Amino acid sequence: DLTFSKQNALLRAEYQADYKSLRFFTLLSGLLNTHGLELNADILGTDKMNTAAHKATLRIGQNGVSTSATTSLRYSPLMLENELNAELALSGASMKLATNGRFKEHNAKFSLDGKATLTELSLGSAYQAMILGADSKNIFNFKI
């Protein structure tokens, strides 16, 4: 669907597919108005026990550009999740990423964030895991 009016333009496209026990769904949408442009994507795939999903947004406006995305996978006994947020504006840029995963008794987490402005530059990350009975952890911070 594509809709135009004096105030905005809307876009929406939806797709579905089924095959045996598998189901797929996709939704793409967008909005253009005086505040800017926003695009969204939602994707989902499932069967009786497992799920994979992705959701993303892109915004372009007077204040800058931002994006976010979330992805998850559950395929028993495996579980993965990822989340990303980023922004670029006249005042600077920032980004955050968080990822974690689990397979039976094993797990790992990772995060990364950064920021850049006219007066500051920073980067940080953290890693923590329990794999094959061994604990590990690493933290990194950098700032100017």
UniProtKB/Swiss-Prot annotation:
It is found in: Cytoplasm; Secreted; Lipid droplet. Transmembrane segments: none annotated. The keyword tRNA processing does not apply. Keywords: Cholesterol metabolism, Chylomicron, Cytoplasm, Heparin-binding, LDL, Lipid droplet, Lipid metabolism, Lipid transport, Secreted, Steroid metabolism, Sterol metabolism, Transport, VLDL. Disulfide bonds: none annotated. Detected in liver (at protein level). Highly expressed in liver. Detected at lower levels in jejunum, duodenum and kidney. PANTHER family: APOLIPOPROTEIN B, APOLIPOPROTEIN B-100. Apolipoprotein B is a major protein constituent of chylomicrons (apo B-48), LDL (apo B-100) and VLDL (apo B-100). Apo B-100 functions as a recognition signal for the cellular binding and internalization of LDL particles by the apoB/E receptor. This is Apolipoprotein B. The gene is APOB.
